[in-house]
Structure formats: C-alpha cells, structure tokens
Amino acid sequence: MNYKIPVSVLVLVHTADLQVLLLERADRPGFWQSVTGSQDAGETLLQTAQRELAEETGIVAEASILTDWQRQNRYEIYAHWRNRYAPGVTHNTEHVFSLKLPAVQDIVLAPREHLDCQWLPWREAADCVFSWSNAEVIRELPLRMSQRT
C-alpha cells in the first residue's frame, strides 16, 4: 500500500491589499481553507506548494514568486484519516508558503476537492477557516507584509 507522507504544505494566496483566497472543501461542505496538500515522494516542499496551487486553483506559479515562511505547524491527524498513513503515524508537519497576487483573480477549482472559492479581507478569512493553523497564518499576514516592504 502507498501511504501518504505525513508532511504537507499550506499555501496562503492573497493580494497586496490583503484579500485572502479561501476554498470550500468538497468532503466537508462549509469548511473553508487555504490551499493545502500532502508532499509526494521525491518532491521538495516548494514543488509540493507549486503542485497543490496548480491542482487546486489553476494558478501556475514560478518557484521564485512563492514565499517560504520557514514556519512549521505540527498537528494530530484526525483518527478517521490515519488509515491513509503508515501504521503508528499520528501527526503531520505542515509547512507554510504564500503567494502574493497583484489583484483578485478567477480560480479554476478542482471539483473533487473543492465546491467553491471566495476572496475575503484577511480578518474575515481568519474567522472563516476551520483550521487553527490556517487562522494563525492569516492573522500573521499583515505583519509579514509590513516586514517585506
């Protein structure tokens, strides 16, 4: 059996004026999140971020425009998803990236993964996501942006 690697990425897609892209999960309607996904064997984290971004949004981004936050979140894998991982694996390590776009743009959803998308001001987006790690990253966005200017 091919088990999932317990390493993933979260890619925060946003605009310069701090509009944040959220995707509604197909397997859990009403649950909103940023781009996320597990690392495939042989991929670097940056390659994982690029692949997930393209698969989930249709955005093809050069590696040079993705920002690696050098931040990791470790969290427990939900019990009902543990069968996807090797026996004994209980935690996942999530690596954070972001992509700043000049403006809101149309998104091409992966219909098996997401039902809908929306662009929200960062505060609303942070309140809308179901994952604590996603909310923390969104809340850090204004500070991160101010440090880059």
Task: Give the positions of each predicted feature.
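Conserved N-terminal beta-strand and adjoining loop/helix that marks the start
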Residues: M1-V20, A41
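Low-complexity, intrinsically disordered short peptide segments enriched in small/polar/basic residues
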Residues: N2, P6, D17, R74, ...
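Short, acidic/hydrophobic/Gly-rich beta-strand patch recurrent on exposed beta strands
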Residues: L22-R25
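A conserved beta-turn-beta hairpin within the catalytic core of GNAT-like acetyltransferases
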Residues: R28-F31
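A short gly/proline-enriched turn/hairpin at secondary-structure junctions
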Residues: Q33-T36
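Unchanged
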Residues: Q39-W132
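Charged phosphate-binding loop/patch that engages nucleotide di/tri-phosphates or the phosphate backbone
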Residues: A126-T149
